[in-house]
């Protein structure tokens, strides 16, 4: 019997012009019609997902929009190819579990 529930999530990556930044694209809307940028961990309160991403020691900033997340790593970090599998697996599991990406109320309250 096929188990029904949360959909299977796939994540692929796209390079950006900045070699320290990588775009992770999901087959699911994450933040429809909006975007939010977290320059550092202290700004990530409105996003449980961003808070979790900042637990990776090499993550410098997080940008969440429509169906993608753009991550910037610290320049001292290993090559993206060394950390992409870990990030992809984390995002896949996080999204398949149906966890909250952005808390809308906190995001609105955090706007300047």
Task: Name the predicted role of every residue range.
Residues 50-68:
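Short acidic amphipathic segments
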Residues 37-41, 45-46, 57-58:
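Compact, charge-rich alpha-helical regulatory domains located at protein termini
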Residues 77-95:
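Charge-rich, low-aromatic oligomerization/scaffolding segments with amphipathic character
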Residues 98-112:
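Long, charged amphipathic helices and adjacent flexible linkers at domain junctions
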Residues 17-40:
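Short glycine-/aliphatic-rich beta-strand segments at the starts of folded cytosolic domains
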Residues 2, 13, 19, 52:
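Long, contiguous binding/interaction regions
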Residues 1-8:
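N-terminal mitochondrial targeting presequence
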Residues 67-76, 80:
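Short glycine/threonine-rich beta-strand-turn micro-motifs
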């Amino acid at each position: 019997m096929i188990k029904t529930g949360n959909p299977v999530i796939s994540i692929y990556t796209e390079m950006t012009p900045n070699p320290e930044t990588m775009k992770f694209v999901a087959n699911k809307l994450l933040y429809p019609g909006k975007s939010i940028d977290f320059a550092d961990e202290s700004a990530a309160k409105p996003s449980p997902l961003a808070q979790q991403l900042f637990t990776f020691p090499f993550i410098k900033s997080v940008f969440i929009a429509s169906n993608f997340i753009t991550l910037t790593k610290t320049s001292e970090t290993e090559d993206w190819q060394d950390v992409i599998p870990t990030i992809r697996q984390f995002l896949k599991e996080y999204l398949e579990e149906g966890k909250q990406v952005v808390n809308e109320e906190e995001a609105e309250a955090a706007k300047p």
